[in-house]
């Protein structure tokens, strides 16, 4: 009896001593499992990663190239009386803005631009990624598939962000003055109804959807040709190749869609005068001739080209670091 009791007491004591160690090990194991579960959960949502990568890339490009968008809007908003006998160029508008509104005036409309571009670019890349995964099943898109994917993804983003696009255009024109984005939304809704928040949406889609479709086609086809044409390529050169392919694709896509951008701007700035696309196109041609459809083409081409090239370069790099194929 005495001998059997002693080991029992030792075993109980040993269990008491071991229990903190076991609890710590169990706690560490649970924490390890929690981390693994968290990582696994994140891996189950690649579309969210694509959205975040797109939003970050959109933020960087918007901050850098906002002045070009403002100059483009000001050039397109010029009336025939403002032009006079001499043609007003981007440099003249730039100097006027700096002289009358200071250097920071070039970033007027930054708030709606950020509100539009950050989620807008995120929605575009998220929709594009999910569409690729669903329809392509991992194989690279053909030229036609790239056009369709780009147009569809941009249309989704364009419809979602249309009210902010209207506000951004009016901010940049210098004609309208709103206290805040909310005040602008309320003012437009009260004076023009819900249609005012989607003013120029058709022209916007006619501009953005073909641009994104053509851009994605030129970008993906050029990038594939360049990367496949080199047997061994330094990894440090890939961002430069992505950026160069983006520049090439942006120039071509910008020139094709420039007339739709001019029509969109006039419809959003003067909704009473330019009520539908055909009327807007007729009045622009009557007042400015064929050249009127290409007002602001230089700053727009620079901005859209550089912005898209940077957005895609940042997006490709971030997706690669997250272990996802863009």
From Swiss-Prot:
Task: Kindly name one Pfam family recorded for this protein.
Answer: Mito_carr
**Stretches forming Solcar repeats:** 45-134, 141-225, 237-321
Q: Which residues cross the membrane?
A: 51-76, 109-135, 147-172, 200-223, 241-267, 296-314
Provide the Gene Ontology terms for cellular component: mitochondrial inner membrane
Q: Which organism is it from?
A: Mus musculus (Mouse)
Write out the function statement from the record: Mitochondrial glycine transporter that imports glycine into the mitochondrial matrix. Plays an important role in providing glycine for the first enzymatic step in heme biosynthesis, the condensation of glycine with succinyl-CoA to produce 5-aminolevulinate (ALA) in the mitochondrial matrix. Required during erythropoiesis.
Q: What protein name does the entry list?
A: Mitochondrial glycine transporter
Membrane topology for this entry? Multi-pass membrane protein
């Amino acid at each position: 009896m005495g001998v059997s009791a002693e080991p029992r007491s030792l075993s109980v004591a040993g269990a008491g001593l071991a229990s903190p160690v076991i609890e710590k090990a169990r706690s560490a194991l649970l924490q390890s499992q929690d981390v693994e579960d968290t990582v696994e959960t994140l891996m189950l949502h690649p579309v969210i990663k694509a959205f975040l990568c797109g939003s970050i890339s959109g933020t960087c490009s918007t901050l850098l190239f906002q002045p070009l968008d403002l100059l483009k809007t000001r050039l397109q908003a010029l009336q025939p009386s403002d032009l006079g006998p001499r043609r007003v160029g981007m440099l003249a508008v730039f100097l006027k803005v700096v002289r009358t509104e200071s250097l920071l005036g070039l970033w007027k409309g930054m708030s709606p631009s950020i509100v539009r571009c950050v989620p807008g670019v995120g929605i575009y890349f998220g929709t594009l990624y999910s569409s690729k995964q669903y329809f392509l099943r991992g194989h690279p898109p053909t030229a036609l598939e790239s056009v369709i994917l780009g147009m569809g993804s941009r249309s989704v983003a364009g419809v979602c962000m249309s009210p902010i696009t209207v506000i951004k255009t009016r901010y940049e024109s210098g004609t309208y003055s709103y206290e805040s984005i909310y005040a602008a939304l309320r003012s437009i809704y009260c004076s023009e109804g819900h249609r005012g928040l989607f003013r120029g949406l058709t022209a916007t889609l006619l501009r953005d959807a073909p641009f994104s479709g053509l851009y994605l086609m030129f970008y993906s086809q050029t990038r594939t040709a360049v990367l496949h044409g080199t047997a061994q390529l330094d990894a440090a050169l890939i961002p430069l190749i992505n950026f160069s392919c983006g520049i090439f694709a942006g120039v071509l896509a910008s020139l094709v869609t420039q007339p739709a951008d001019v029509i969109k701007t006039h419809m959003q700035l003067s909704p009473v005068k330019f009520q539908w696309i055909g009327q807007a196109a007729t009045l622009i041609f009557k007042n400015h001739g064929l050249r009127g459809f290409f007002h602001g083409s230089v700053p727009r081409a620079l901005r859209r080209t550089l912005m898209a090239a940077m957005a895609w370069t940042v997006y490709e790099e971030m997706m690669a670091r997250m272990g996802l194929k863009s």
